[in-house]
UniProtKB/Swiss-Prot annotation:
It is found in: Cell membrane; Bacterial flagellum basal body. GO terms for biological process: bacterial-type flagellum assembly; protein secretion. PANTHER family: FLAGELLAR BIOSYNTHETIC PROTEIN FLIQ. InterPro entries: Bac_export_3, FliQ. The keyword Transmembrane applies. This is Flagellar biosynthetic protein FliQ. The chain crosses the membrane at residues 17-37, 48-68. Keywords: Bacterial flagellum, Cell membrane, Membrane, Transmembrane, Transmembrane helix. Role in flagellar biosynthesis. Belongs to the FliQ/MopD/SpaQ family. It is a multi-pass membrane protein. Pfam families: Bac_export_3.
Length: 88
């Protein structure tokens, strides 16, 4: 039973990383590119770094939302099926 719970915890961490990684990477890459652009042009405008990151994150969320939803629904179905095994 404990090994099954450990497998479940590991699967939870994997799914959490897989769902959050595209959004975080998009923000990271866009932030890095904007920072390099600001450093080379010596433009120090705060909104210049904030707005592209927000747009990139929203774009990635829109593109990956169906995949994220399917992954979460499959995981939820798996958890619901495992409830009797974990309890009993």
């Amino acid at each position: 039973m404990e090994s099954q719970l450990m497998k479940l915890a590991i699967e939870t961490y994997k799914i959490t990383l897989m769902i959050s990684l595209p959004v975080l990477l998009a923000g990271l890459v866009v932030g890095l590119l904007v920072s390099i652009f600001q450093a080379t042009t010596q433009i120090n405008e705060m909104t210049l770094s904030f707005v592209p990151k927000i747009l990139a994150v929203i774009g990635v969320l829109i593109l990956t939302m169906p995949w994220m939803t399917n992954m979460l629904l499959d995981y939820t179905k798996t958890l619901i099926k495992l409830i009797p095994k974990i309890i009993g």
